[in-house]
Regions:
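Bacterial N-terminal signal peptides
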Residues: 9-17
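Generic short beta-strand segments
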Residues: 54-61, 84-92, 116, 134-138
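Edge beta-strand at a domain terminus
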Residues: 27-42, 101-109, 137-156
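N-terminal helix-cap/turn-to-beta initiation motif at the start of protein domains
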Residues: 36-54, 82
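Positively charged n-region of N-terminal signal peptides that target proteins for export
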Residues: 1-9
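Short, solvent-exposed coil/turn segments at beta-strand boundaries
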Residues: 49, 80-88, 106-110, 124-132, ...
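N-terminal glycine/threonine-rich, aromatic-flanked beta-hairpin/loop signature
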Residues: 64-110
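Sec-dependent signal peptide cleavage junction
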Residues: 16-31
Protein backbone atom coordinates (compact mmCIF):
# COMPACT_ATOMS: atom_id res chain seq x y z
CA UNK A 1 0.00 0.00 0.00
CA UNK A 2 2.77 2.43 0.94
CA UNK A 3 4.66 1.57 -2.26
CA UNK A 4 1.62 2.42 -4.38
CA UNK A 5 1.06 5.68 -2.52
CA UNK A 6 4.73 6.58 -2.93
CA UNK A 7 4.56 5.76 -6.66
CA UNK A 8 1.49 7.96 -7.11
CA UNK A 9 3.15 10.84 -5.24
CA UNK A 10 6.32 10.52 -7.34
CA UNK A 11 4.25 10.53 -10.53
CA UNK A 12 2.45 13.68 -9.38
CA UNK A 13 5.77 15.37 -8.58
CA UNK A 14 7.15 14.52 -12.02
CA UNK A 15 3.97 15.79 -13.66
CA UNK A 16 4.16 19.08 -11.74
CA UNK A 17 7.85 19.49 -12.62
CA UNK A 18 7.14 18.88 -16.31
CA UNK A 19 4.20 21.32 -16.29
CA UNK A 20 6.36 23.95 -14.60
CA UNK A 21 9.12 23.52 -17.17
CA UNK A 22 6.62 23.87 -20.01
CA UNK A 23 5.11 27.01 -18.48
CA UNK A 24 8.53 28.70 -18.42
CA UNK A 25 9.47 27.61 -21.93
CA UNK A 26 11.26 30.22 -24.03
CA UNK A 27 9.00 31.50 -26.82
CA UNK A 28 9.88 30.28 -30.30
CA UNK A 29 9.10 31.84 -33.65
CA UNK A 30 7.14 28.76 -34.71
CA UNK A 31 4.77 29.04 -31.73
CA UNK A 32 3.81 32.68 -32.29
CA UNK A 33 0.33 33.56 -33.64
CA UNK A 34 -0.12 33.84 -37.37
CA UNK A 35 -0.66 37.09 -39.22
CA UNK A 36 -4.13 37.57 -40.64
CA UNK A 37 -3.79 36.69 -44.29
CA UNK A 38 -4.66 39.24 -46.92
CA UNK A 39 -8.17 38.21 -47.89
CA UNK A 40 -10.10 39.97 -50.63
CA UNK A 41 -13.26 39.69 -48.52
CA UNK A 42 -11.69 41.24 -45.40
CA UNK A 43 -10.91 44.93 -45.41
CA UNK A 44 -9.27 46.19 -42.22
CA UNK A 45 -9.77 49.83 -41.27
CA UNK A 46 -7.91 52.25 -39.02
CA UNK A 47 -10.26 51.27 -36.19
CA UNK A 48 -8.97 47.68 -36.32
CA UNK A 49 -5.52 48.93 -35.28
CA UNK A 50 -6.35 51.85 -32.97
CA UNK A 51 -5.59 51.74 -29.28
CA UNK A 52 -2.72 51.41 -26.84
CA UNK A 53 -0.25 48.56 -27.36
CA UNK A 54 2.78 47.19 -25.50
CA UNK A 55 5.41 44.67 -26.59
CA UNK A 56 4.81 41.22 -25.17
CA UNK A 57 7.60 39.34 -26.99
CA UNK A 58 10.47 40.50 -29.22
CA UNK A 59 12.35 38.55 -31.91
CA UNK A 60 15.58 39.54 -33.70
CA UNK A 61 15.23 37.69 -36.97
CA UNK A 62 13.71 34.48 -35.61
CA UNK A 63 15.60 34.54 -32.28
CA UNK A 64 13.64 35.42 -29.14
CA UNK A 65 15.13 38.29 -27.10
CA UNK A 66 14.75 38.73 -23.36
CA UNK A 67 14.22 42.33 -22.19
CA UNK A 68 17.91 42.44 -21.22
CA UNK A 69 18.97 41.31 -24.72
CA UNK A 70 16.66 43.91 -26.29
CA UNK A 71 18.38 46.62 -24.25
CA UNK A 72 21.87 45.25 -25.01
CA UNK A 73 21.14 45.48 -28.76
CA UNK A 74 20.14 49.13 -28.36
CA UNK A 75 16.51 48.40 -29.19
CA UNK A 76 13.60 49.88 -27.28
CA UNK A 77 10.43 48.47 -25.83
CA UNK A 78 8.05 51.42 -25.72
CA UNK A 79 4.31 51.68 -25.40
CA UNK A 80 2.64 52.57 -28.70
CA UNK A 81 -0.64 54.32 -29.42
CA UNK A 82 -2.29 54.15 -32.82
CA UNK A 83 -4.80 56.96 -33.25
CA UNK A 84 -5.80 59.70 -35.66
CA UNK A 85 -3.72 58.40 -38.56
CA UNK A 86 -0.53 58.35 -36.49
CA UNK A 87 1.68 55.82 -34.73
CA UNK A 88 2.68 57.42 -31.44
CA UNK A 89 5.61 56.16 -29.34
CA UNK A 90 5.41 57.06 -25.67
CA UNK A 91 9.03 57.79 -24.75
CA UNK A 92 10.31 58.16 -21.21
CA UNK A 93 13.82 59.57 -20.87
CA UNK A 94 15.76 62.06 -18.77
CA UNK A 95 13.48 64.84 -20.11
CA UNK A 96 10.42 62.98 -18.80
CA UNK A 97 7.59 61.37 -20.74
CA UNK A 98 6.79 62.65 -24.22
CA UNK A 99 5.32 61.43 -27.49
CA UNK A 100 7.07 60.87 -30.82
CA UNK A 101 4.68 60.34 -33.70
CA UNK A 102 4.74 59.39 -37.37
CA UNK A 103 1.90 59.45 -39.87
CA UNK A 104 1.03 56.12 -41.44
CA UNK A 105 -0.71 54.75 -44.49
CA UNK A 106 -3.09 51.80 -44.46
CA UNK A 107 -2.43 49.55 -47.46
CA UNK A 108 -3.28 45.89 -48.04
CA UNK A 109 -4.52 45.53 -44.44
CA UNK A 110 -1.17 46.78 -43.09
CA UNK A 111 -0.10 50.00 -41.41
CA UNK A 112 3.08 51.28 -43.05
CA UNK A 113 5.24 54.06 -41.61
CA UNK A 114 8.79 55.32 -41.24
CA UNK A 115 9.92 56.32 -37.76
CA UNK A 116 11.90 59.44 -36.87
CA UNK A 117 15.20 57.61 -37.44
CA UNK A 118 14.26 56.54 -40.97
CA UNK A 119 13.47 52.95 -40.02
CA UNK A 120 10.66 51.41 -42.07
CA UNK A 121 8.00 49.59 -40.10
CA UNK A 122 4.82 47.59 -40.62
CA UNK A 123 1.94 46.76 -38.28
CA UNK A 124 -0.18 43.71 -39.12
CA UNK A 125 -3.21 42.24 -37.39
CA UNK A 126 -2.84 38.77 -35.86
CA UNK A 127 -5.42 36.02 -35.82
CA UNK A 128 -5.72 36.45 -32.04
CA UNK A 129 -6.66 40.16 -32.38
CA UNK A 130 -3.27 41.50 -31.30
CA UNK A 131 -0.70 43.18 -33.54
CA UNK A 132 2.75 42.38 -34.83
CA UNK A 133 5.19 45.23 -35.50
CA UNK A 134 8.06 44.53 -37.87
CA UNK A 135 10.97 46.99 -37.97
CA UNK A 136 13.76 46.69 -40.50
CA UNK A 137 16.86 47.89 -38.64
CA UNK A 138 20.44 48.28 -39.90
CA UNK A 139 22.72 45.39 -39.00
CA UNK A 140 26.21 44.23 -39.93
CA UNK A 141 26.93 44.95 -43.57
CA UNK A 142 24.18 46.33 -45.76
CA UNK A 143 21.53 43.76 -44.86
CA UNK A 144 18.81 44.99 -42.50
CA UNK A 145 17.46 42.65 -39.83
CA UNK A 146 13.77 42.34 -39.09
CA UNK A 147 12.98 43.00 -35.44
CA UNK A 148 9.49 41.75 -34.63
CA UNK A 149 7.46 42.95 -31.67
CA UNK A 150 4.33 40.99 -30.74
CA UNK A 151 2.07 43.71 -29.34
CA UNK A 152 -0.84 43.31 -26.90
CA UNK A 153 -3.24 45.69 -25.16
CA UNK A 154 -1.85 46.70 -21.74
CA UNK A 155 -4.83 45.22 -19.92
CA UNK A 156 -4.24 41.69 -21.34
Amino acid sequence: MMKKLFSVLMALCLLCTAASALAEETPTWEKMPLVVTVDEDVELTDADFEGDWIADKVFYGTDYLTPEEVEAKGLAIRPVRIAGGKVINIVTDEAGEHEVSAEYTLENNQILFTDGEGIEAVFEKLEDGNLVLSLFVPAEGDTPVCVTYFMVHPET
